[in-house]
């Protein structure tokens, strides 16, 4: 027998559906993701902390879940506060599957709802903007309780989540990407890169390792002096959740590294925004953000278009860029900034996710550019 569930939006909209995860309640900012696949990677992406993720593709869970496809680093954890889908298939099938999506959600205590009109929900979020919401799952639940909890959630503006989503102890990383029939590879490592962990995705670390980087991953609040004492060949700024402007410790550390050294610096997602803020620019909250694996982005220098993975609710405000920041990429959906490069330092960043997971690999050459900067600096 199915368990009822309710999704309430702060504007008063109510959706009634079926629970497919843990019973209880959860709140967060409701966003929509247009990726057709990769639901496990999305759920375990730390960038989704404090968010209720709506997947617009109607059938979610076809291929089940496994231990390998997690993006939450050494600790297998679901970071999304909740999941919202249209339909959960009765059967799951894949040679790598270890359990169903419903079993996975219950195991990780994730409150989730299915059997609602996700097209209607997506239109609301697109037109009105991302808004706070609540999922209630269980018997004897009420719309009034769900709505009250949705309106009580504080939102993401001004919220520093990077220090909460990083590994507090730091760690070393040497593992490369997964290959069919081989599993995860062990590449030859030629460079030492310190990676700031603001909520880093596992596949980012693997793609850096694929290119010869031995990674020392440090917590978000690590001072610049400690990073420089490690004598790295380059510094990486990871993705992560929350409001970048609230991460004053990260902004200060990156500013010190960029302004006082010539170390190559590469930032992704939140790391992109941190580099911009450290260089004197400002960021802004977006209407409904970019979440998906089919976002077109133009490379302004080459005039080419890339299909990218995106996951962010804040953006760099191009009108505030200082003279030493050059715009390199721009979204073809809404014209927002997607990439910058310092003109006076070997530092650059990209708003989207070149590591994909899930999504296309059109932007993978950005990792190669980072290696080129490291090679040039070592000469």
UniProtKB/Swiss-Prot annotation:
One of its GO terms (biological process) is L-arginine biosynthetic process. L-glutamine binds at residues 47, 240, 242, 270, 273, 311, 313-314. GO terms for molecular function: ATP binding; carbamoyl-phosphate synthase (glutamine-hydrolyzing) activity; glutaminase activity. It is an enzyme of class 6 (ligase). Residues 1-188 are annotated as: CPSase. Residues 192-379 form the Glutamine amidotransferase type-1 domain. Pathway: Amino-acid biosynthesis; L-arginine biosynthesis; carbamoyl phosphate from bicarbonate: step 1/1; Pyrimidine metabolism; UMP biosynthesis via de novo pathway; (S)-dihydroorotate from bicarbonate: step 1/3. Pfam families: CPSase_sm_chain (PF00988), GATase (PF00117). Its EC number is 6.3.5.5. InterPro entries: Anth_synth/Amidotransfase, CarbamoylP_synth_ssu, CarbamoylP_synth_ssu_N, CarbP_synth_ssu_N_sf, Class_I_gatase-like, CPSase_GATase1, GATASE. Keywords: Amino-acid biosynthesis, Arginine biosynthesis, ATP-binding, Glutamine amidotransferase, Ligase, Nucleotide-binding, Pyrimidine biosynthesis. It catalyses: hydrogencarbonate + L-glutamine + 2 ATP + H2O = carbamoyl phosphate + L-glutamate + 2 ADP + phosphate + 2 H(+). PROSITE patterns: GATASE_TYPE_1. The active site is at 269 (nucleophile), 353, 355. Composed of two chains; the small (or glutamine) chain promotes the hydrolysis of glutamine to ammonia, which is used by the large (or ammonia) chain to synthesize carbamoyl phosphate. Tetramer of heterodimers (alpha,beta)4. NCBIfam families: CPSaseIIsmall, PRK12838.1. Small subunit of the glutamine-dependent carbamoyl phosphate synthetase (CPSase). CPSase catalyzes the formation of carbamoyl phosphate from the ammonia moiety of glutamine, carbonate, and phosphate donated by ATP, constituting the first step of 2 biosynthetic pathways, one leading to arginine and/or urea and the other to pyrimidine nucleotides. The small subunit (glutamine amidotransferase) binds and cleaves glutamine to supply the large subunit with the substrate ammonia. This is Carbamoyl phosphate synthase small chain. It comes from Acinetobacter baylyi (strain ATCC 33305 / BD413 / ADP1).
């Amino acid at each position: 027998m199915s368990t009822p569930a309710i999704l309430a939006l702060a504007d008063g909209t109510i959706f009634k559906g079926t629970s497919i995860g843990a019973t209880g309640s959860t709140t967060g900012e409701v966003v929509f993701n247009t990726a057709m696949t990769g639901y496990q990677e999305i759920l375990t992406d730390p960038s989704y902390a404090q968010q209720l993720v709506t997947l617009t593709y109607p059938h979610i869970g076809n291929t089940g879940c496994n231990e390998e496809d997690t993006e939450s680093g050494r600790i297998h954890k679901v970071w999304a506060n909740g999941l919202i889908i249209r339909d959960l298939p009765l059967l799951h099938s894949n040679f790598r599957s270890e359990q169903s999506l419903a079993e996975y959600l219950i195991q990780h205590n994730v409150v989730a709802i299915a059997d609602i009109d996700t097209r209607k929900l997506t239109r609301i979020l697109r037109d009105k903007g991302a808004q706070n919401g609540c999922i209630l799952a269980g018997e004897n639940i009420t719309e009034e309780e769900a709505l009250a909890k949705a309106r009580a959630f504080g939102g993401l503006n001004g919220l520093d989540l990077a220090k909460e989503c990083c590994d507090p102890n730091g760690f070393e990383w040497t593992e490369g990407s997964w290959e069919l029939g081989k599993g995860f590879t062990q590449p030859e490592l030629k460079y030492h890169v310190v990676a700031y962990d603001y909520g880093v995705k596992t596949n980012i670390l693997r793609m850096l390792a694929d290119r010869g980087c031995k990674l020392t991953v440090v917590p978000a609040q690590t001072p610049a002096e400690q990073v420089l004492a490690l004598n790295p060949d380059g510094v990486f700024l990871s993705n992560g959740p929350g409001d970048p402007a609230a991460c004053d410790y990260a902004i200060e550390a990156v500013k010190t590294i960029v302004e006082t050294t010539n170390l190559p610096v590469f930032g992704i997602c939140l790391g992109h925004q941190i580099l911009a803020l450290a260089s004197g620019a400002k960021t802004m909250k977006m209407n409904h953000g970019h979440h998906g694996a089919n976002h077109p982005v133009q490379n302004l220098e080459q005039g080419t278009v890339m299909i990218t993975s995106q996951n962010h609710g804040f953006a760099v405000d191009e009108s505030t860029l200082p003279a030493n920041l050059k715009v390199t990429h721009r979204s073809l959906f809404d014209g927002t900034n997607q990439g910058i490069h310092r003109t006076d330092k070997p530092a650059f960043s990209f708003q989207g996710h070149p590591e994909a997971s899930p999504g296309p690999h059109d932007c993978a050459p950005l990792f190669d550019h980072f290696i080129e900067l490291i090679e040039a600096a070592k000469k």
